[in-house]
Amino acid sequence: MSQTDTITALATPPGRGSVGILRVSGPLAAPVARALLGKLPRPRQAEYLPFRDDDGTTLDQGIALFFPGPHSFTGEDVLELQGHGGPVILDLLLQRIVAMPGVRIARPGEFSERAFLNDKLDLAQAEAIADLIDASSAQAARSAINSLQGAFSGRIHELVKALTNLRIYVEAAIDFPDEEIDFLSEGKIEASLNDVIARLERVRTEARQGSLLREGMKVVIAGKPNAGKSSLLNALAGREAAIVTAIAGTTRDVLREHIHLDGMPLHIIDTAGLRNAGDEVERIGIERAWREIEQADHVLLMVDGAATPLSDPDMLWPAFIARLPSGMPVTVVRNKADLTGESVAISDISGYLLITLSAQSGVGMDLLRTHLKQSMGFTGGTEGGFLARRRHLDALETAATHLQQGKEQLVSACYGELLAEELRLAQQSLSEITGEFSSDDLLGRIFSSFCIGK
């Protein structure tokens, strides 16, 4: 679809509300205003006006705002109508606007996409709009605001600028090999490269924190029947999310809870007890349990401390350990310390972290919560932080790889051409984050996940 079309959409959620907002952006925003309002509102000044149908009858009345481009969110002429929030009246207004020649319904995220294409926002800032809307905690919302205001983009621009300056030196050494000073071997370039690598690593650390705030961690509670998995889910959730009985196999299906640990989203999944299935329903539940385990970020292996003195997973349940995906983080949770009299503690057993606690009484739960945060490297600090997506982490990792490869070329052989190429590729990877270097396919995937009116 053409970017020169005039687009319109609801900017508020569907359903009843006190206020409903319609947004129009494009070259026909002013003619739409004249047709609908009988006049063009003064720029950037709220006016209370009737919203009229094509026969002159009043459909609604409310606040009209007109923002001439380029001084608007999208960089185009923008009309905003704030009327009553009834779905019927909003639909009538939307039909009235779309009936005008040259106006169409906006695609998801098209307003933000136009803001990006018109240099009102870079890509990381545009993504921050969606992240702010989807924020599930106060910390995530604050970090999304920081990203929207350019905190993340600013760090990336600083790195790109440093890389640009470094490339100038390297290109000079390549283009003027007969100069008396050998820029590549004198140490200046290596020192500058090390500085950029260190700065990039600091940004990567902050980005990983931002990604945890946005995505959270998927923790699957697994174990044999009646080990206390559902009790642990309830203890972490702070409510009775799962039915708990003394009957083994009470949980037949996957149960999910979404909580926060000092701002970090935690997706807790309780699964059916793993054993040879007694019936078809239980067999299906166990299959689903294994699917969740295989996709987990972390597995909590529940052990019934009252039923066995063993805690070493390799001895206690070798078949379970053998089936886990390679490299899967596993924490052994030895439950029912209130019955066994064992001390609440964190220890190591055969390379696995072992936490002894009581899910029923809550003793030792703070140890588990702290461990879960530490296992993902979450620090909880958000002041000045920003949110990051998986694609941002991938781009930062790619840039770091190219810089390390460039350093190897410089230190081992002083190959200026190869170093210059690695620096160029690193800069390109960083530019993908802000959208200075992005494919149309990437832009389409990003903006299609936005709300219609954003």
Curated annotation (Swiss-Prot):
<dbReference type="InterPro" id="IPR025867">
    <property type="entry name" value="MnmE_helical"/>
</dbReference>
<dbReference type="InterPro" id="IPR031168">
    <property type="entry name" value="G_TrmE"/>
</dbReference>
<dbReference type="GO" id="GO:0005525">
    <property type="term" value="F:GTP binding"/>
</dbReference>
<feature type="binding site">
    <location>
        <begin position="226"/>
        <end position="231"/>
    </location>
    <ligand>
        <name>GTP</name>
    </ligand>
</feature>
<feature type="binding site">
    <location>
        <begin position="245"/>
        <end position="251"/>
    </location>
    <ligand>
        <name>GTP</name>
    </ligand>
</feature>
<feature type="binding site">
    <location>
        <position position="230"/>
    </location>
    <ligand>
        <name>Mg(2+)</name>
    </ligand>
</feature>
<feature type="domain" description="TrmE-type G">
    <location>
        <begin position="216"/>
        <end position="377"/>
    </location>
</feature>
<dbReference type="GO" id="GO:0002098">
    <property type="term" value="P:tRNA wobble uridine modification"/>
</dbReference>
<dbReference type="Pfam" id="PF10396">
    <property type="entry name" value="TrmE_N"/>
</dbReference>
<feature type="binding site">
    <location>
        <position position="120"/>
    </location>
    <ligand>
        <name>(6S)-5-formyl-5,6,7,8-tetrahydrofolate</name>
    </ligand>
</feature>
<protein>
    <recommendedName>
        <fullName>tRNA modification GTPase MnmE</fullName>
        <ecNumber>3.6.-.-</ecNumber>
    </recommendedName>
</protein>
<dbReference type="InterPro" id="IPR004520">
    <property type="entry name" value="GTPase_MnmE"/>
</dbReference>
<feature type="binding site">
    <location>
        <position position="251"/>
    </location>
    <ligand>
        <name>Mg(2+)</name>
    </ligand>
</feature>
<comment type="function">
    <text>Exhibits a very high intrinsic GTPase hydrolysis rate. Involved in the addition of a carboxymethylaminomethyl (cmnm) group at the wobble position (U34) of certain tRNAs, forming tRNA-cmnm(5)s(2)U34.</text>
</comment>
<keyword id="KW-0819">tRNA processing</keyword>
<keyword id="KW-0342">GTP-binding</keyword>
<keyword id="KW-0547">Nucleotide-binding</keyword>
<feature type="binding site">
    <location>
        <begin position="335"/>
        <end position="338"/>
    </location>
    <ligand>
        <name>GTP</name>
    </ligand>
</feature>
<keyword id="KW-0630">Potassium</keyword>
<dbReference type="InterPro" id="IPR027368">
    <property type="entry name" value="MnmE_dom2"/>
</dbReference>
<dbReference type="GO" id="GO:0003924">
    <property type="term" value="F:GTPase activity"/>
</dbReference>
<keyword id="KW-0479">Metal-binding</keyword>
<dbReference type="GO" id="GO:0005829">
    <property type="term" value="C:cytosol"/>
</dbReference>
<dbReference type="GO" id="GO:0030488">
    <property type="term" value="P:tRNA methylation"/>
</dbReference>
<dbReference type="InterPro" id="IPR005225">
    <property type="entry name" value="Small_GTP-bd"/>
</dbReference>
<comment type="subunit">
    <text>Homodimer. Heterotetramer of two MnmE and two MnmG subunits.</text>
</comment>
<feature type="binding site">
    <location>
        <position position="226"/>
    </location>
    <ligand>
        <name>K(+)</name>
    </ligand>
</feature>
<dbReference type="InterPro" id="IPR006073">
    <property type="entry name" value="GTP-bd"/>
</dbReference>
<dbReference type="Pfam" id="PF12631">
    <property type="entry name" value="MnmE_helical"/>
</dbReference>
<keyword id="KW-0460">Magnesium</keyword>
<dbReference type="InterPro" id="IPR018948">
    <property type="entry name" value="GTP-bd_TrmE_N"/>
</dbReference>
<dbReference type="InterPro" id="IPR027417">
    <property type="entry name" value="P-loop_NTPase"/>
</dbReference>
<dbReference type="Pfam" id="PF01926">
    <property type="entry name" value="MMR_HSR1"/>
</dbReference>
<dbReference type="InterPro" id="IPR027266">
    <property type="entry name" value="TrmE/GcvT_dom1"/>
</dbReference>
<feature type="binding site">
    <location>
        <position position="245"/>
    </location>
    <ligand>
        <name>K(+)</name>
    </ligand>
</feature>
<feature type="binding site">
    <location>
        <position position="247"/>
    </location>
    <ligand>
        <name>K(+)</name>
    </ligand>
</feature>
<dbReference type="GO" id="GO:0046872">
    <property type="term" value="F:metal ion binding"/>
</dbReference>
<feature type="binding site">
    <location>
        <position position="250"/>
    </location>
    <ligand>
        <name>K(+)</name>
    </ligand>
</feature>
<keyword id="KW-0378">Hydrolase</keyword>
<feature type="binding site">
    <location>
        <begin position="270"/>
        <end position="273"/>
    </location>
    <ligand>
        <name>GTP</name>
    </ligand>
</feature>
<keyword id="KW-0963">Cytoplasm</keyword>
<comment type="similarity">
    <text>Belongs to the TRAFAC class TrmE-Era-EngA-EngB-Septin-like GTPase superfamily. TrmE GTPase family.</text>
</comment>
